[in-house]
Design a protein with these regions (language model features):
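Membrane-associated lipid acylation/remodeling enzymes share a hydrophobic transmembrane-juxtamembrane segment
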Residues: 117, 150-200
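Membrane-anchoring hydrophobic helices of lipid-metabolizing enzymes
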Residues: 1-97, 102, 131-136, 142
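Residue-level detector of family-conserved "landmark" positions at structurally sensitive sites
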Residues: 39-40, 121, 148, 191
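Catalytic core of membrane glycerolipid acyltransferases/transacylases, capturing the structured
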Residues: 89-149, 172-184
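A generic structural signal for well-ordered alpha-helical segments
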Residues: 86, 111, 138, 158, ...
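Short Gly/charged-rich anion-binding patches and loops
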Residues: 24, 105, 133, 153, ...
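Active-site metal-coordination segments of metallo-dependent hydrolases
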Residues: 23-24, 124-128, 187-191
Length: 200
């Protein structure tokens, strides 16, 4: 609780001084139609920043608080049976997911629950100090992290080793990395990599 309080205070300060991201968040919420007006968009922006502050604390404290026995996988029983099976018909599994919940801890938790090693592909953090702090606490023997700038070879290597391959695909892709489709009623460039790997 003390960690949440301290990080919440620091992130509120960040929100005050980081006007560029504050303004961009409000604009995106309004553009997507999630917020009905600027006042609601600002409230959602503050709430989002505070959730990020909690996530950072949870990652830093993961070594002390993480308990595999408390992890459970939810969803349809058929999906659970398939996802937690070690067989998978000898086919590699590709997970395309988004930034929701504590996605940093979720990769490790899922790999340990399924007992199948996972490789997650990520883009580098804009702040290298925060990035190092997060990476030092979230990677383990069952969960390997790979910088997406390394290209396609690490992905193919992970697939050939029957590791679970995970990609976060809810961020705007570059013009040479994605294809345009509708997202929240607006055109967005989405990543093609998971679909191309599946077809391969």
């Amino acid at each position: 609780k003390a960690g949440y309080a301290l990080s919440g205070f620091l992130f509120r300060l960040l929100l005050v001084f980081d006007r560029r991201h504050h303004t961009r968040s409000v604009q995106h919420l309004l553009h997507a139609g999630i917020a009905k007006d600027k006042a609601q968009a600002r409230r959602l922006t503050v709430a989002s920043y505070l959730e990020f502050s909690k996530l950072l604390v949870e990652i830093v404290k993961m070594d002390q608080l993480y308990d595999p026995a408390k992890i459970r996988v939810v969803g349809s029983q058929a999906a659970i049976d398939i996802s937690l099976s070690q067989e998978h018909d000898n086919k590699p599994v590709i997970i395309a997911t988004a930034h929701y919940g504590n996605w940093e801890v979720a990769g490790t938790a899922y790999a340990e629950k399924s007992r199948i090693p996972m490789t997650s592909f990520m883009r580098p953090f804009s702040n290298p100090l925060i990035g190092k702090m997060i990476l030092d606490h979230r990677a383990g023997d069952m969960h390997k992290l790979v910088d997406k700038r390394e290209g396609i070879r690490p992905i193919l290597r992970a697939i050939s080793q029957n590791r679970i391959t995970t990609m976060l695909i809810d961020q705007h892709a570059g013009a040479n990395e994605g294809i345009t489709c509708e997202f929240f009623g607006h055109p967005a460039c989405v990543h093609m990599t998971p679909a191309l790997l599946h077809l391969k």
